[in-house]
């Protein structure tokens, strides 16, 4: 991570931290960096989610791109993975998504994709940051024919929708409940599932610029759970603001999280001989029950740090085609290069059709262990050294011995705050409370600030 770019681009409160002035500079400097690494005039796709600040930041960003001669294709409201798909398939130099994903409406973000559809690499981001930190903007200022051109490209949305439909199966009137989070999937999710011959019930499809992720979507699935029960739907599908993640709901109204979704799709691919190296890439936060279910099926695991960025890195490095996070980011590399909630939803319904099983039957193969997470405030300098404290190392070792393999402890530093996170999983709530509270008490006594 750099000074401006985090693990998911540049984020901040719109018009406060992430200002139009900064958006202009990101467009101008980002466009210039792109132009230095290819011949000819770069072609860049730009899209946004439904936040009220989206058009403001889009206008500034586009102005910056045009000021250095970039050919800009404006996609309007589109899911983040839609940008990734179009960049790859339409030979663009790069893509830019304006979104803060599952964050509330007051936030926004700007994320760059390279011409390969993957998030821009660290080296390119560092070049942009160096220009942002320069004392003076000394970049060329072309005029007349040297300026960039702007093309409105709303047909990009339909191209992305058509692609998604080709990855699925006719659902034969299956009842599907959708929650589009009042975000980027507000139009596309409806279109896609109608094209797949589903009978749909929809919430979260009335964005007003302020209601994105507000009580709806993958981080607030309660309304979708109720809708599934009321409508008698076979499945509920909740996306987030930019539709790069999915949380599902079974026909009984119970949550099917990213771990279970990955297991269901992974087992299906494994049985067909289509799971690359018979391996699923996951993070340290995936539930122990997920790991045990994979072991039972003979499916391998590759485990990374928290963050879809690290999952994708591992997939690219070793040629894996399925990975993701408990939070609902699922990457299916055979189809797209980033987490894609709508694509994942389609693959989940495909498994239901081909197996003839309900979602609850498929999900029941994974027994999720109760999990508890406690954040403890510590000095920033100590959060990476906690395991060097003898008393902390000793209590963790003692608790792990008591678990005897039927539980899991994870103590890790926050990547962004002066916090130490203590997490445990165990067969019962009482056990998990005991393990976490015991470790947390020792951590607080040794290095805690509260």
UniProtKB/Swiss-Prot annotation:
Active site: 101 (phosphoserine intermediate)
SUPFAM superfamilies: Phosphoglucomutase, C-terminal domain, Phosphoglucomutase, first 3 domains
Documented EC number(s): 5.4.2.10
Cofactor(s) recorded in Swiss-Prot or TrEMBL: Mg(2+)
GO terms under biological process: carbohydrate metabolic process; peptidoglycan biosynthetic process; UDP-N-acetylglucosamine biosynthetic process
N-terminal signal peptide: none
Keyword hit for Membrane: no
Domain of life, source organism: Bacteria
Keywords: Isomerase, Magnesium, Metal-binding, Phosphoprotein
Keyword DNA repair: no
GO terms assigned for molecular function: magnesium ion binding; phosphoglucosamine mutase activity; phosphomannomutase activity
Chemical reaction(s) catalysed: alpha-D-glucosamine 1-phosphate = D-glucosamine 6-phosphate
Post-translational modification: Activated by phosphorylation.
Family: Belongs to the phosphohexose mutase family.
Function: Catalyzes the conversion of glucosamine-6-phosphate to glucosamine-1-phosphate.
Full protein name: Phosphoglucosamine mutase
UniProt organism field: Streptococcus thermophilus (strain CNRZ 1066)
């Amino acid at each position: 991570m750099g000074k401006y770019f985090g693990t998911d681009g540049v984020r901040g409160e719109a018009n406060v931290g992430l200002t139009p002035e900064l958006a202009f500079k990101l467009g101008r400097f980002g466009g210039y960096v792109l132009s230095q690494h290819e011949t000819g005039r770069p072609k860049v796709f730009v899209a946004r989610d439904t936040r009220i600040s989206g058009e403001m930041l889009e206008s500034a960003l586009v102005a910056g791109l045009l000021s250095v001669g970039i050919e800009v294709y404006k996609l309007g409201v589109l899911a983040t993975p839609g940008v990734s798909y179009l960049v790859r398939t339409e030979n663009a130099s790069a893509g830019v998504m304006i979104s803060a994903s599952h964050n509330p409406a007051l936030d926004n973000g700007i994320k760059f994709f390279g011409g390969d559809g993957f998030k821009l690499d660290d080296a390119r981001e560092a070049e942009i940051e160096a220009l942002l930190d320069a004392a003076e903007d000394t970049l060329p200022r072309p005029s007349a024919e040297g300026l960039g051109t702007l093309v409105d490209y709303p047909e990009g949305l339909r191209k992305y929708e058509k692609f998604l439909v080709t990855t699925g199966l006719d659902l034969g009137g299956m009842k599907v409940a959708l929650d589009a989070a009042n975000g980027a999937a507000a139009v596309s999710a409806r279109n896609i599932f109608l094209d797949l011959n589903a009978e749909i019930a929809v919430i979260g499809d009335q964005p007003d610029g302020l209601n994105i992720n507000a009580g709806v979507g993958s981080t607030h699935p309660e309304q979708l759970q109720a809708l599934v029960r009321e409508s008698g739907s076979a499945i509920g599908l909740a996306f987030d603001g930019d539709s790069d993640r999915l949380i599902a709901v079974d026909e009984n109204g119970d949550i099917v999280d990213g771990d279970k979704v990955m297991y269901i799709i992974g087992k299906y691919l494994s049985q067909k001989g289509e799971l690359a190296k018979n391996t699923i890439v996951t993070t340290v936060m995936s539930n122990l029950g997920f790991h045990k279910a994979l072991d039972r099926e003979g499916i391998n695991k590759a485990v990374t740090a928290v963050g879809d960025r690290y999952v994708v890195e591992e997939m690219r490095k070793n040629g894996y085609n399925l990975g993701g996070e408990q939070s609902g980011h699922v990457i299916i590399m055979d189809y797209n290069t980033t987490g894609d909630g709508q694509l994942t939803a389609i693959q989940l319904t495909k498994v239901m059709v081909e197996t003839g099983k309900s979602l609850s039957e498929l999900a029941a193969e994974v027994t999720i262990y109760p999990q508890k997470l406690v954040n403890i405030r510590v000095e920033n300098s100590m959060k990476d050294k906690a395991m060097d404290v003898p008393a902390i190392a000793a209590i963790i070792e003692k608790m792990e011995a008591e678990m005897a393999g039927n539980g899991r402890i994870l103590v890790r530093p926050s990547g962004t705050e002066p916090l130490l996170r203590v997490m445990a999983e165990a067969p019962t709530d009482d056990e998990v409370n005991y393990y976490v509270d015991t470790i947390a008490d020792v951590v607080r006594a040794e290095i805690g600030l509260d």
